[in-house]
Design a protein with these regions (language model features):
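Core structural elements
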Residues: 172-190
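Positively charged
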Residues: 1-168, 193, 204-207, 213-230
Length: 230
């Protein structure tokens, strides 16, 4: 994916961001995340983003003291829960209205950020002051991944089979490393803490190692469970 002429310059990024806390939802630089917006506070957030710089920060709420993730029955409201300190800003690149009052939007991941402090609510949605300085490399288009494709694709095939995931292998084999790693990190059913680890991996090479390890662990765990049942 090439840089868009509509993307802001790194040194012109805003000091504050609206945030959308969603557990188990991951956005990475250059990834694309479709969202169905229906709560009044997030409808207001979307309208404000459209009228401004079109940036929205995706963050995950931390698990509650009872171990539930925000949004689960018995868990805290994700709109009030404590959040992880690292998120990813997405630029609103697609927008549609529905007849029943929802917005269908797509965020394209732009750059990660560190949360410095939370600000007062605006129309019910949360805002934070952010620091971008540690993530300038997120805008680099050709970072090396160190991914061993043959080994990785072999493990991935086992993972897809065990989890009943259908895959277009021609597309997978043609995909550049970054696009493949980003897509898998965002769509695979990893736990929220695992998705946060993928987000916080410093470089693409680190993220490649994390996702390969996660898939190997999932194959070993699910595979041993299947063996035990037979």
């Amino acid at each position: 994916m090439t840089e868009s002429p509509f993307d802001p310059k790194f040194d012109e990024l805003p000091q504050t961001l609206p945030i959308f806390p969603l557990s188990g939802v991951l956005l990475l630089p250059r990834g694309r995340l479709p969202l169905n917006i229906f709560e009044p506070r997030y409808l207001a957030m979307t309208r404000d983003a459209l009228a401004g710089d079109r940036l929205i920060g995706m963050v995950q709420p931390k698990p509650g003291p009872d171990g539930h993730k925000a949004g689960d029955a018995g868990a805290r409201d994700s709109g009030a829960a404590e959040i992880y300190p690292v998120g990813c800003a997405g630029r609103l690149t697609a927008f549609a209205e529905t007849d029943d009052g929802r917005y269908l939007i797509t965020l394209t991941g732009f750059c990660r950020f560190q949360v410095q402090e939370e600000l007062p609510l605006n129309q019910g949605y949360r805002r934070v002051r952010v620091d971008w300085s540690g993530y300038a490399a997120d805008r680099e288009m050709a970072a090396p991944s160190g991914l061993r494709r043959d080994d990785f694709e072999s493990t991935l095939a086992h993972y897809f089979r065990l989890y009943g995931i259908q895959a277009d292998w021609a597309t997978i084999k043609e995909a550049p490393d970054e696009r493949l790693i980003t897509s898998l990190a965002m769509i695979c059913p990893f736990a929220p803490t695992e998705k946060q680890a993928l987000l916080e991996a410093p470089t693409l090479a680190d993220r490649a190692r994390v996702i390969h390890t996660l898939i190997e662990m999932a194959v070993a765990e699910r595979g041993s469970g299947d063996t035990a049942r037979h």
